[in-house]
Amino acid sequence: MNHPTLTIDPGAVAANWQALAARHTGEVAGVVKADAYGLGAALIAPALAAAGCRSFFVATLDEALSLRALLPAARIGVLNGCPPGEEGTMRARELRPVLGSLAACARWRGAAGDDKAPPSFLHLDTGMNRLGLDRDEAAHLIAHPTLLDGLGLTHVMTHLVAAEEPDASANAAQRERFAAFAARFPWLRTSLANSSGLFLGPGFGSDLARPGYALYGGNPTPTAANPMRPAIALAAPILQIRAIASGETVGYNGTWRAARPSRIATIGVGYADGLPRSLSNRLTARWQGKIIPVAGRLSMDLTTFDVTDHPDIAPGDVIELIGPGHDIDAFAAEAGTIGYEILTSLGPRYRRVVKSV
């Protein structure tokens, strides 16, 4: 390996989708927003389709248009809805907006004119307080159900606040509120579970699940072993190793000081490549399965490690940042963030290697 390399395994993503589909009684979609969580929708979406996935979700209209070019027959939902004035574009490309307000419903209905409205989703906010019908709008629809006529609605959906915390009271509260609303519109199918929601038990089953993070190898059950296959590995070769004396410092502002004569290895990856600067003096990487700690602050293009305890390590040897010995969730925990952020931040300077199926 001569360059920092991000290895992507579309076969693992497909296998993860199949595993989730096997445990769910309803349909399982694939969430491929943010360029398939940074791994490349052009690579991941066809792999999911080949595995049997027929419904997909993205966040924006532009993402949906790109996905439509890849998958002409797929059912594509747009989570952020239809931008005002773009109803014609979405209708022409058979894209399905997630309607999250009465105003959005009115625009979508109005754009249909005398034609039959293309399919769409209705989004009920049950506690996230971002997008979706609020309590007053939901009550208004219950009182005036004909407002849903002409929208082409297929599903009502909501988004769980804390599905990765099985004991969180919000889970049951959201499920109950969602069920009460959905019961008023029994002709609509339901969509409730995200990745972690699929592991909350039968009470969280629905007609359509929407996993994202778990597809890419993230752990949907943080309090238990990860049931998913890893989909990425991140590694970089050592550029240089330097010997320093006891008392010398490494990196900007000298935040790491050698307590003994030490050897410092430098790799050509930094925060410009998506490694959070919060990993400074916290990251642990792997060399031939052995733990090596970061030394000092991460730079824009470089990261340094203390390899004093490994006299055989040499320039050109490969440092594993994310891989079997240190998965995406462990890496994210050291950074004080979540794996979602890490995945979607990995930059364009890596050599991207696609693992063959």
UniProtKB/Swiss-Prot annotation:
SMART domains: Ala_racemase_C. Catalyzes the interconversion of L-alanine and D-alanine. May also act on other amino acids. Substrate binds at residues 130, 300. The gene is alr. GO terms for biological process: D-alanine biosynthetic process. The lineage of its organism: Bacteria, Pseudomonadati, Pseudomonadota, Alphaproteobacteria, Acetobacterales. GO terms for cellular component: cytosol. Pathway: Amino-acid biosynthesis; D-alanine biosynthesis; D-alanine from L-alanine: step 1/1. GO terms for molecular function: alanine racemase activity; pyridoxal phosphate binding. The active site is at residues 33, 252. Belongs to the alanine racemase family. SUPFAM superfamilies: Alanine racemase C-terminal domain-like, PLP-binding barrel. It catalyses: L-alanine = D-alanine. It comes from Acidiphilium cryptum (strain JF-5). Transmembrane segments: none annotated. Its cofactor is pyridoxal 5'-phosphate. This is Alanine racemase. The modification N6-(pyridoxal phosphate)lysine is found at residue 33. Keywords: Isomerase, Pyridoxal phosphate. PANTHER family: ALANINE RACEMASE (PTHR30511), ALANINE RACEMASE, CATABOLIC-RELATED (PTHR30511:SF0). NCBIfam families: alr. Its EC number is 5.1.1.1.
